[in-house]
């Protein structure tokens, strides 16, 4: 029985010892597990911190690189903008200079063209004015000449009729006188015919002078002797070819042309000459 108790006590002691050992082992395991957990947690924290530090460093490096790159880009863009702005400014100045030169050239051309036009217009106006003045002078000369000829035409015609009548009456008187003296008798023929011939000769010369005066063939002295009212005028005219010529006409009180009565005077002169020939 004693041995059973001893065995029971020994077993109880062993059980307690085992229990204590198990508790101690459990406690140690718990502590070891706790230490492991702490170590793992510490390692994780360290790793996390290392990762955070590395990420922070990486972020800082990336940010610095980005900042540097951005600054480089900004610097390059600023330089590019400045270069482009300088090029645009240079191009704009060149365009403005070219436009100014073009404007000056165009203005100078317009001024030259305007001056040429004004000079041409002035010359044209002067030429037109000179032509108009010449035309007016020619018209005035023509009007004066036409009026003068119109006024003198009737006087010329009247003078021609008077001269023709004078020549006709002179010839008739000579014929009548010759006829009357021829009937006076044959015994007085010699002396009478001599006187008659002289008288007829004088009348014929008077008729001839009248005809010469009519034709404008008499001299100025003869005109003044037989026709005291006779004057001599000189007319000057200019033809279209600018050749100037003078025409001298002897008139009795006015200008006339002999063509109006040329035929009658010639007939009267022939009649007088025939009578003189018969008497002589």
Swiss-Prot record:
Bias type Basic and acidic residues, positions: 28-39, 115-127, 136-145
Keywords, comma-separated and alphabetical: Repeat
UniProt entry tagged with the keyword Repeat: yes
Region (Disordered) residue spans: 1-156, 220-241
Bias (Low complexity): 40-114, 230-239
LEA 11-mer repeat repeat windows: 31-41, 53-63, 75-85, 97-107, 119-129
Induction, per UniProt: By abscisic acid (ABA).
Described purpose of this protein according to its UniProt entry: Lea proteins are late embryonic proteins abundant in higher plant seed embryos.
Family statement drawn from the similarity comment of this UniProt entry: Belongs to the LEA type 4 family.
Protein name from the UniProt record: Late embryogenesis abundant protein 76
Source organism per UniProt: Brassica napus (Rape)
Lineage: Eukaryota, Viridiplantae, Streptophyta, Embryophyta, Tracheophyta
